[in-house]
Amino acid sequence: MTTSQVLHPRWADTLMYVYEKSPNENNQNKSQIMEGLSGNCPATHCRELISHPALGRHSGTIATHQGSVYSDISSPETGRQCPAPQTSSSASLSYGYPFGNPYYGCRLSHSHNVNLQQKPCSYHPAEKYAETSSALPTEELSSRAKEFAFYPSLASSYQAVPGYLDMSVVPSISVHPEPRHDALIPMEGYQHWALSNGWDGQVYCSKEQTQSSHLWKSPFPDVVPLQPEVSSYRRGRKKRVPYTKIQLKELEKEYAASKFITKDKRRRISATTNLSERQVTIWFQNRRVKEKKFVSKSKTNNHMHT
């Protein structure tokens, strides 16, 4: 038997329950099936179809579209409507799904004789994820039925389990952005690899997007591209300043007296030649290395001649 239930006309969206009953079930369970709409769903195949808000104004076409998929069988309780909550129409829930197919089917297990109030492992009650806002008081939230929109999870904090579709069940009551609660909805025939390139995939974008000035060519031959300015504060090798003849004569005189310089001698030479003590020390070091190379080269030449 297929039963279509449409909510109160003042609700902006349409909630349709389709029940598929096995042939061995009798008609006495019809009343229990209808009670499943208020929260106690019997052990039958239950599919919840939630429409897109943009399709709310075409509620008449939804039933026509579903008629091509599910054949409606007339029954005495077909026209029974869900009890409308005692709330104003301005406090109606709104939800949106901007991606792809606006319907998601949820199938409950037929072999387990449990209702939704017993909280099976794959069931998450609506009260757990209800978020309150300033627009609706707490009494109205508890009195009316909760509606949820299913969104693909953009970021999940748990490992994806094969056989379960990674979805997010979020109430659309709150308008401010809040972290969505993730839920596992069992889906039949679901392949985990089919969504490997879905929302969880990361797109790499290089941050280094530099443009070389020498590669730029102007369409006009007279235009010369601007070259990048060389920084005047670039730290490089200091320009070498040659010593004067008077300074070199004084240094050679002290070196002839002693190849190694003392602290007092370095201060005296620095004051006489107007050089820093560091310059005097470096000059003596270079002078010793130069003499060592000269001696080594002289020995090599003498050895070759002999």
Curated annotation (Swiss-Prot):
GO terms for cellular component: nucleus. Residues 236-295 bind DNA. It comes from the Eukaryota. The keyword Thylakoid does not apply. GO terms for biological process: fin regeneration; regulation of transcription by RNA polymerase II. GO terms for molecular function: DNA-binding transcription factor activity, RNA polymerase II-specific; RNA polymerase II cis-regulatory region sequence-specific DNA binding. CDD domains: homeodomain. It is found in: Nucleus. Signal peptide: none annotated. InterPro entries: AP_axis_regulatory_Homeobox, HD, Homeobox_CS, Homeodomain-like_sf, HoxA13_N. Belongs to the Abd-B homeobox family. Sequence-specific transcription factor which is part of a developmental regulatory system that provides cells with specific positional identities on the anterior-posterior axis. This is Homeobox protein Hox-C13a. The gene is hoxc13a.
